[in-house]
Amino acid sequence: MKKYILDLTVTENVRLHANYVLLKLTSPSPLPDMLPGQFAEIRVDGSPTTFLRRPISINYVDRQRNEVWFLIQLIGDGTRQLGEAKAGDTVNVVLPLGNGYTMPQKPSDKLLLVGGGVGTAPMLYLGEQLAKNGHKPVSYT
């Protein structure tokens, strides 16, 4: 799958908890194909301690809005800076990275999606894609 380096615009940064934010980024053009379970490398500017990009799981892709969401746990300088991003800010990302989940070929009566903490991030997009393919994902939070 081809990789892209994109400058995306922050549309919303929602504080979900003291240590978690939902960062929504939009593109002026259609987003590339992304699979559930893939991730992006997000550049954090403005600090000497954040030289490397941060790997963040793709939480959801809204094709109608050309928007990609990231659930971010604020655990270090880089993720804390991302947690401070404001609507209108530009964020540079490399995506999609990783292989994503192997999707079942035959529709199933029930599939259990399990994740904890920030590990729940890719479950939203995975559940939606499974449902589109005739599966019935079960979730428990």
Report the location of each language-model feature:
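A short, basic/flexible loop-to-alpha-helix module at the beginning of a structural domain
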Residues: 96-106
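Generic structural signal for buried aliphatic residues
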Residues: 40, 91-94
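Residues at the starts of beta-strands that form the adenosine-phosphate
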Residues: 90, 110, 135-138
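Conserved small/polar residues in nucleotide/adenosyl-binding loops
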Residues: 141
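Cofactor-binding loop segments of dinucleotide-utilizing enzymes, especially the Rossmann-like FAD-
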Residues: 73, 96, 116
